[in-house]
Amino acid sequence: MNKFKYLLFLVVFAVFFLTFAFFDNSSKSHQDDDEQKPIILIHDVSPVYFKELKEIVKIIDKYHYQNRSYLFLIVNHANKYNLKNYPEFVDYLHKLEKEGYHIEFHAYNHIDDEFNCNKTVAEEKLNKSFKILEECGFNPKKIKYFIPPRYKLSEDAEKLFLGRNITIILENKMITEKDGKIVEISITNREYTWYLPKPLVKVAEKIATTDYKLSIKENRKFFLSIHPKAVNYGSGLEFLDYFLNETSKN
């Protein structure tokens, strides 16, 4: 009898262990799949492109990419479009944030290579920018990523952002600070929709799919950069719809 109970215990334990292992591995596999999906970087988010942003968001929402989409804001575009003066646009950004979109920082006015400057100028612009964000109801402490305009920035500006625990995203790498050391991480950051004409959309789709698969194979994060207005031209949105559909299947 004792032997029977012991065998029964082993069977029950084995079933429990295998079930747990299956669901644990399934969960890890699902998490790994999600981590491999593209991260969408939306540059130049400002009231100037309100209509265009809505068109982009419609496609992102269609494939449930909200949590992997990052909105890089220009807080005072061309020194004419201060976020404080556009409450409807700000409310829309808050709505997107609640839905999972990430609010990040791109520029103060986006004039020239504005953060390719000395420490004093960089600090002044960043402080002004964060003040505007606060006045619009955003929490600057939640800003984790920065894309410099035209991917240009000085060493002084780099130190400033890293000192505030903000990771810098460039064309082929991310720069961050870990345990007091500056770390550079290789990434794939591509833009296929810069005023993409209709005849080239299929070519862009094939190139993007190849780049994405190669990035996964080489264990690099894949970033899809898009600019409002540029992506809304020609077949840009058609490409975006295709690419998110393909990558959402993983």
Curated annotation (Swiss-Prot):
The keyword Ion transport does not apply. Its main location: membrane. Keywords: Membrane, Transmembrane, Transmembrane helix. SUPFAM superfamilies: Glycoside hydrolase/deacetylase. It is found in: Membrane. It comes from the Archaea. InterPro entries: DUF2334, Glyco_hydro/deAcase_b/a-brl. The keyword Thylakoid does not apply. It is a single-pass membrane protein. The chain crosses the membrane at residues 4-24. One of its GO terms (biological process) is carbohydrate metabolic process. Gene3D superfamilies: Glycoside hydrolase/deacetylase (3.20.20.370). It holds the Pfam family DUF2334. This is Uncharacterized protein MJ0505. GO terms for cellular component: membrane.
